[in-house]
Amino acid sequence: MDAGLKRELEQKVRSGERLTREDGIALYESDDLAWLGGLAHEVRTRKNGDVVHFNVNRHLNMTNVCTASCAYCSFQRKPGEKDAYTMRIEEAVKLAKAMEGENLTELHIVNGLHPNLPWRYYPRSLRELKAALPEVSLKAFTATEIHHFETISGMSASDILDELIDAGLESLTGGGAEIFDWEVRQHIVDHRTHWEDWSRIHRLAHEKGLKTPCTMLYGHIEEPRHRVDHVLRLRELQDETGGFQVFIPLRYQHDFVDMKDGKVRNRLQARTQMATGAEALKTFAVSRLLFDNVPHVKVFWVMHGVQTAQLALQHGADDMDGSVVEYKITHDADDFGTPNKLTREDLLDLIRDAGFRPVERNTRYEILREYEGPDPARRESPQPMRV
């Protein structure tokens, strides 16, 4: 990128002018990560100061039985297959209550698209979880799951959301987005929920007063132009509804996915390494610069590793997710080398060591507690050469 284009993009960002598709592609083509990260950090600081948000949450994956066979997924199993499981609701409640003494604030629930579970299983599970943990927010179900519920129940998404909200739902999850462009999506997704239905369901959720996250799965067969298109679709929907709280880039776990036979899956598997740390940081930076109307950008440490997550905080991200606890969707792929859980103290140390001030939030991004910032005497900055 020549100096003139750099100055033009800097001026746009600093004046608050919206970046275009062409600008986004130009940013991805830049090989000056320090400049790109610095520009994204300016925007992140303007929106969120020196704060990094986190929460104390527990992920629940109540079934891995799924009708779909998406090319990127090692979580799903078919009915009767080895390692297929479906929890009784009582089991899920027991797992959730095991964290009761840790000031849990959120349950994050994502499942496979089970062909035989009745629709009533899902609102009942929310009601029983809410009854057991009334102070805990329930963030549950992807738009793909809501679309699946339409199929198995014969109900509309609007009526489904109404019943789930009545049962205690406070937010959808952001999954099922992957990459929206059909050029890529047709090769990686094996279900019927594409942009039209994904956006329809999140639009409905926003109309009903729910705030939701949105995601992008990157680092597989997509190109930078597909990432730019993905973010711009979300940005346009955010212009319309204002309902997205946070954008979450998710790094695809290449090395650990057990792909099945077939041309498409071999095409995915052909790239034997994950997106590099530098590519991950560039993705966070460009996302922060393009997605100007979303308040927060989250780095999900489970899918990036804690050191890359710390560096992402200096490249546009301002949220480090939470304690997580047993995220099967990634860890079922293989041992990715990240823990199943970080304690509150772990998160505080990681945030401070990256040079930021930790703030504990709830699902709605309401501040629960502010902590002191980094101690210069003990700060251990993340090392770029380890990314």
UniProtKB/Swiss-Prot annotation:
UniProt KW keywords: 4Fe-4S, Iron, Iron-sulfur, Menaquinone biosynthesis, Metal-binding, S-adenosyl-L-methionine, Transferase
Gene Ontology biological process terms from the UniProt entry: menaquinone biosynthetic process
Catalytic reactions of this protein: 3-[(1-carboxyvinyl)-oxy]benzoate + S-adenosyl-L-methionine + H2O = 6-amino-6-deoxyfutalosine + hydrogencarbonate + L-methionine + H(+)
Residues holding [4Fe-4S] cluster: C66, C70, C73
PROSITE patterns xref list: RADICAL_SAM
Cofactor note text: Binds 1 [4Fe-4S] cluster. The cluster is coordinated with 3 cysteines and an exchangeable S-adenosyl-L-methionine.
Domain Radical SAM core: 52-279
Entry annotated with the keyword NADP: no
A Pfam family annotated for this UniProt entry: Radical_SAM
Molecular function GO terms recorded: 4 iron, 4 sulfur cluster binding; 7,8-didemethyl-8-hydroxy-5-deazariboflavin synthase activity; aminodeoxyfutalosine synthase activity; iron ion binding
Matching SMART domains: Elp3
Pathway assignment: Quinol/quinone metabolism; menaquinone biosynthesis
EC nos: 2.5.1.120
Highest taxon in the source lineage: Bacteria
NCBIfam families to which the protein is assigned, alphabetical: CofH family radical SAM protein, mena_SCO4494
Sequence similarity: Belongs to the radical SAM superfamily. MqnE family.
Name of protein: Aminodeoxyfutalosine synthase
Annotated source species: Streptomyces coelicolor (strain ATCC BAA-471 / A3(2) / M145)
Highest classification ranks of the organism: Bacteria, Bacillati, Actinomycetota, Actinomycetes, Kitasatosporales
